[in-house]
A protein has these predicted regions:
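N-terminal strand-loop element at the rim of the active site
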Residues: 2, 7-15, 22-73, 81-82, ...
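Carbohydrate-associated surface elements
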Residues: 42, 149, 168
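Membrane-proximal helix-turn-helix segments that form the acceptor-binding/catalytic region
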Residues: 121-143, 150, 156-157
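Acidic anion/phosphate-binding donor-loop and adjacent secondary structure
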Residues: 125, 152-155, 166-184
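Conserved donor-binding/catalytic core segment of Leloir-type glycosyltransferases
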Residues: 178-207, 216
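Nucleotide-activated donor-binding/catalytic signature segment of Leloir-type glycosyltransferases, i.e.
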Residues: 225-247
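Acidic donor-binding loop of glycosyltransferase active sites
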Residues: 253-267, 280-281
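Short acidic/histidine- and often glycine-rich active-site loop of Leloir-type glycosyltransferases
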Residues: 287-293
Length: 293
């Protein structure tokens, strides 16, 4: 049995692809008998008993997204204290050069370290670190990329060798045989609101569909209110806000189509994988990250 520390740079109480991977991996490792703990920022109560919170996050712009990082000194001190106290056999750092807990752990070098690189596109901190301090990535004992696009970005700025291991999901959670799609004509969109996610494009296309079609939008974030006001006249649209994982799985089981209309910068389509696991027909943009699925 190993004591495994899994560190997330992103707030674990805010939904996101990296966060879901971190928590899901910890659950699976614990089922295998390992003592896995997750360290990361939390904006509220930790989502699992095995999570050690490292303080609140700060919204930070990256790759057309707003990501919840914790680059402040207090988070660094909590990270140092937690790693010292836990005496992990191995550390698994997700986005190891993202400002915050993962960089702190990388600099401490208190255990063998695996780094998993998720991002694709254009990430500001890669460019900054490449100018003199990219050597910190050499502290990693192994490097993983979740897709060829993530590998390309990391290698471009950091060099090194990477093993590609695609993201996974806990597929049994998405099997809902007791729910029937029936005659549903509902299109389902789920994800935080960012322009690159293509929700505005989906709404423009939806206006052209027949009156008996529905659109379920599970999304929140800055800018969603403007879209909601613009399409307030269309009563076929249900604005659900942020929903729980349980409700997401229910709607994936009921919808006629799951739509992932992202415009760019998708490293891997976890949400597409979830929809497929639930048996939902998927319409997605022709992006490399989605084709990996």
């Amino acid at each position: 049995m190993l004591r495994i520390g899994i560190i997330s740079p992103y707030s674990l109480t805010i939904p996101g692809g990296v966060q879901s991977q971190v928590l899901g991996l910890a659950r699976e490792l614990r089922k295998m008998g390992h003592e896995a703990r997750v360290l990361g920022p939390c904006d509220g109560p930790p989502p699992e008993p095995f999570v050690t919170p490292l303080g609140n996050s700060l919204p930070t712009a990256a790759n057309g997204s707003i990501v919840p990082l914790a680059p402040d000194p207090s988070a660094a001190l909590r990270t140092i204290r937690a790693i010292n106290d836990e005496a992990f056999d191995v550390l698994h750092l997700h986005e190891p050069i993202a400002p915050g807990p993962t960089v702190t752990a990388l600099l401490l070098r208190l255990a063998p370290m695996i780094g998993t690189f998720h991002a694709a596109g254009d990430i500001a901190w890669y460019g900054r670190l490449s100018k003199g301090v990219n050597w910190i990535a050499d502290f990693l004992d192994a490097r993983i990329a979740v897709s060829p696009q993530a590998q390309e970005l990391a290698h471009r700025y950091l060099g090194g060798e990477y093993e590609i291991l695609f993201n996974g999901i806990e597929s049994d959670l998405y099997l809902r045989p007791e729910i029937s799609r029936g005659e549903s004509k509902a299109i389902f969109f789920c994800g935080r609101y960012e322009p690159r996610k293509g929700l505005a494009t989906l709404l423009e296309a939806f206006e052209k569909l027949s009156d008996d079609t529905e659109l379920w939008i599970a999304s929140d974030g800055e800018g969603i209110a403007d879209l909601k006001a613009k399409y307030a006249h269309d009563h076929r649209i249900s604005w659900l806000g942020r929903i729980t994982d349980a409700e997401k799985i229910d709607r994936l089981a009921k919808c006629a189509v799951f739509c992932a209309p992202s415009l760019h910068s998708e490293s891997f389509g976890i949400v597409v994988l979830e929809a497929m696991a639930a048996g939902a027909p998927v319409v997605a943009s022709s992006l490399e990250g989605y084709r990996n699925v």
